[in-house]
Amino acid sequence: MADVFADGAGVAGGCCVGLSWAHRVGGVTTDDTVTTDDPRDARSVRLTAGDAELTVLPDNGCRIGSLRVGGTELLRQGAAFGSFPMVPWCGRVELGVFRDGAERHQLPVNAPPHAIHGTGRDTAWRTAHAEAASASFTYDLAEPWPYPGRVTQVFELAPDALTLSMGVETIDDSFPAQAGWHPWFLRNLGRGGEDVRIDFSADWQEERGEDHLPTGRRIAPLPGPWDDCFGMSDGVDVTLTWPGELELKVTSRSEWVVIYDHQPEAVCVEPQSGPPNGLNTLPRLVTPIDPLEISTTWRWRTLD
């Protein structure tokens, strides 16, 4: 589940991923050719397409620092800002513990009493490739995650859309993993318009217990406010509308999305490869021949 405090502290299939993803979008450049100044990160990569501008901060967990369309910022700025990758798990892991067969693993408890949102957001990523409207980044899985592997994240910007892709691969033993994104979309775009509206049709809602973890029961979707995981059998499809200003659709082939709207300045629509605590309840194994892959597209159009 999303957590307003955690940020400030935070689809299976396809062929091999890792650096091969970078090769799909072009050759590798050096970091120096793609850096610009940013107050939160000495090394930022900026992509442009039409009037859309994206800033990626590889040293700050490879999060999106800014997404501007026609000069208007769409993502919250400040302590909990932008959009960060959730990897190698999404949401909360109960008491920070997961099991892989007979092996028991303890993760850092960074949202007591649970572990939340993975380690990728706390890690500096390497720039594998960057050009005007696309870039790819990697980092190697290491302690406190107990298995070696590699994560690749690809950004592809168009004048009316942003496509994000992420892959997790093992370089040794198989292991369970999840991946997804945690964007902080501005509730109000600050141009005198109305607050955002969130529209979606879910097949089920993961019932949330008092410990903020799914109980294991799937229930009929409830009205908001939400800090909840929803299931969409045909893939994630959520529309954010700032009336008279902008419409943005978040889509993904993945079935799960967490929606969070408790924060006064932002809302979260988080496509992810499995439900919270899924390392325990719905483990998806990453194997040498079957990496984990997930992607999401954010497509927008102006309404004014």
Located regions from the model:
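Acidic, contiguous internal or C-terminal segments within carbohydrate-active enzymes
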Residues: L54, P58, Y139-P183, N188-G190
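A short, structured loop/turn motif at beta-sheet edges
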Residues: R99-E103, A128-A133, E156-A161, L189, ...
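Extended, loop-rich substrate-binding clefts of extracytoplasmic carbohydrate-active enzymes
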Residues: W21, V28-V34, P108-P159
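Extreme N-terminal basic, low-complexity initiation segments
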Residues: M1-V17
